[in-house]
């Protein structure tokens, strides 16, 4: 009798202890990021690749899968250089999966690089001004451009050293590329000062 009772109790207890389904947290929709946020998404992997990795260029990537505004972009491409390795490497961060760009952070193949060339790295500390502030400064100094009626392309961003200015600059431009831009403005990435067109 005791064995039968214990068997019945064991069966009843085991049937009561089934795991209830756990509610999953809702998936957060992808969000565009600022230039500085995009840079800091790629930096840990670049630093793992080369301890002395320094950025040479930060570039926004516009994507139809996720529209962005206010100085943000759906994806960012950051070029790094390592003087110790004599190599450069491009990392991308993307909020979404799209043709040619993977979601998350991905690295390209290493390429040869030497100091003193056209692509000059800059210290991370020079990235004090983020893209929303650079965009605001660019708009304030683009009254002539915005007086012209008609639709304007979405603004894009490139941060790099140029021969024109002593500090790295955010180039805020309206157009498909830097070379075909309708309008572009340079903003100092360390001070936020307007530098010119």
Where are these regions (language model features)?
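Sec-dependent bacterial lipoprotein signal peptides
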Residues: 1-14
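Long, terminal "pre-/pro-" and other extracytoplasmic accessory regions
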Residues: 16-197
């Amino acid at each position: 009798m005791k064995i039968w009772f214990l068997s019945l109790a064991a069966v009843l207890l085991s049937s009561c202890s089934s795991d209830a389904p756990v509610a999953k947290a809702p998936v957060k929709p992808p969000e565009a990021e600022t230039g500085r946020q995009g840079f800091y998404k790629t930096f840990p992997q670049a630093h793992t690749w080369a301890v002395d990795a320094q950025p040479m260029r930060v570039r926004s990537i516009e994507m139809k899968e996720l529209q962005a505004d206010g100085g943000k972009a759906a994806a960012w491409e950051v070029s790094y250089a390592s003087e110790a390795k004599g190599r450069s490497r491009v990392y991308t961060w993307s909020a979404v999966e799209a043709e040619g760009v993977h979601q998350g952070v991905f690295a390209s193949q290493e390429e040869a690089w030497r100091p003193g060339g056209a692509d000059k790295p800059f210290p991370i500390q020079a990235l004090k001004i983020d893209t929303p502030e650079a965009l605001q400064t660019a708009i304030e100094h683009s009254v002539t451009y915005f007086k012209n009626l008609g639709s304007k392309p979405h603004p894009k961003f490139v941060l790099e050293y140029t021969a024109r200015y002593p500090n790295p600059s955010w180039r805020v431009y309206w157009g498909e590329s830097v070379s075909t831009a309708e309008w572009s403005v340079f903003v100092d990435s360390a001070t936020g000062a307007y530098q010119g067109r």
